[in-house]
Regions:
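Ser/Thr-rich, low-complexity intrinsically disordered terminal regions
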Residues: 18-191
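Bacterial Sec-dependent N-terminal signal peptides
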Residues: 1-22
């Protein structure tokens, strides 16, 4: 009986620490941090080619609504490029007979690590940008998990539905970004 109780306690404790998608939005929230990560295989691609393409991607002007990209690190030994990205996305919402446009701006760190035949994209240190206020999205996630609204330092309020929309938009931004990087990484830019 004692062993059965210990086993039940261990199972309960293990399930209490399991990471679940408590908000149903497929947000990679673990260890109190939101980090998007994707590893992409590219057959017959040399590490140097992938590294060069990653650097070119960060150096180019993007054709969509990115306001600013700043290259922060380009390390050929690690085959790593890191940049700070400010990304804006405008969405339309129908309201009676008119259309309202909301612009969502976020700032994040983008890291691309390259190896032979594959590369990894990491998006982290994500901040919600409002006027001059930068708010870590983890704070917004805690409010969403608790089903509470979030009040910004400047007095603006996001209700639970608004928080859900912010994270849906963040997923769209990350998806668009990863798709664009993937297109650039497979191009042969050799002379």
């Amino acid at each position: 009986m004692k062993k059965l109780l210990i086993l039940a306690f261990i199972i309960f404790a293990k399930s209490a620490f399991a990471q679940k998608d408590t908000v149903g939005l497929n947000i990679p929230f673990a260890n109190n941090t939101i980090v998007y990560e994707k590893v992409v295989g590219v057959p017959n691609a040399a590490k140097n080619t992938l590294f060069g393409n990653a650097g070119l991607w960060l150096a180019e002007t993007r054709p969509y609504n990115i306001a600013d990209i700043q290259l922060q690190l380009e390390d050929p030994v690690l085959s790593r490029v890191v940049g700070k990205v400010n990304y804006s996305l405008t969405e339309s919402n129908k309201f009676f007979l008119s259309t309202l446009y909301d612009t969502y701006i976020c700032s994040f760190t983008l890291q691309i690590d390259c190896k032979d035949n594959k590369y990894r994209i990491r998006i982290y240190n994500i901040q919600d940008v409002g006027n001059t206020t930068y708010t870590p999205v983890e704070k917004l996630m805690y409010a969403l998990i608790d089903s509470k609204s979030y009040t910004f330092a400047d007095g603006g309020i996001l209700k639970v539905a608004d928080l859900q929309n912010r994270f849906k938009t963040l997923n769209t931004i990350v998806s668009n970004l990863i798709t664009d990087i993937t297109k650039s990484m497979t191009v042969d830019n050799s002379f």
